[in-house]
């Protein structure tokens, strides 16, 4: 969804037809993205460092008319530090830059009502035999739990592993 959103924004600004049924957007002065994982080990830069440098570039140069897309910021460190860094970046973008921002995270504490949260939900209409699950963007914070164990089942993990994963997941909710 994030990559497609970035692609549609750039294509529309170039005057190209975007691959969607419906779209409304404001022209952006810049588009900043941080998606995927990339390191530059030859330069001595880990995936986490590159991720932080990309985020810093967006914070330094984004304006109110920019689009910033960040996917799982903070995933390359401990949960404690990751949520702190992601929360700080999100707060800065919301309060200082005030740009349009698509911010994907697994940190539920960052999903605040004033930020217009949405979540990716597994399509209930999808066929159980589908190899690739279909997701839909839904408004609001994601419900407790995730589709992780269901996807692990589809991937063929052993029943013993799935049972233990369900127990651990339940205990951590």
Language model features by range: what are they?
Residues 1-173:
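ATPase nucleotide-binding head domains, primarily ABC-like/P-loop NTPase cores
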């Amino acid at each position: 969804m994030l990559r497609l959103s970035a692609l549609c924004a750039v294509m529309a600004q170039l005057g190209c037809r975007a691959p969607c049924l419906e779209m409304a957007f404001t022209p952006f002065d810049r588009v900043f993205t941080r998606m995927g994982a990339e390191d530059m080990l030859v330069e001595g830069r880990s995936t986490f460092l590159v991720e932080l440098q990309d985020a810093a570039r967006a914070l330094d140069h984004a304006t109110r008319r920019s689009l910033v897309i960040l996917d799982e910021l903070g995933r390359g460190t401990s949960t404690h530090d990751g949520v702190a860094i992601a929360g700080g970046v999100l707060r800065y973008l919301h309060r200082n830059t005030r740009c349009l921002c698509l911010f994907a995270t697994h940190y539920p504490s960052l999903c605040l009502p004033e930020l217009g949260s949405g979540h990716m939900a597994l399509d209930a209409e999808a066929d159980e035999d589908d190899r690739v699950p279909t997701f839909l963007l839904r408004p609001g914070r994601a419900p407790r739990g995730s589709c992780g164990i269901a996807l692990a089942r589809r991937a063929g993990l052993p029943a013993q592993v799935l049972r233990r994963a369900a127990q651990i997941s339940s205990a951590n909710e």
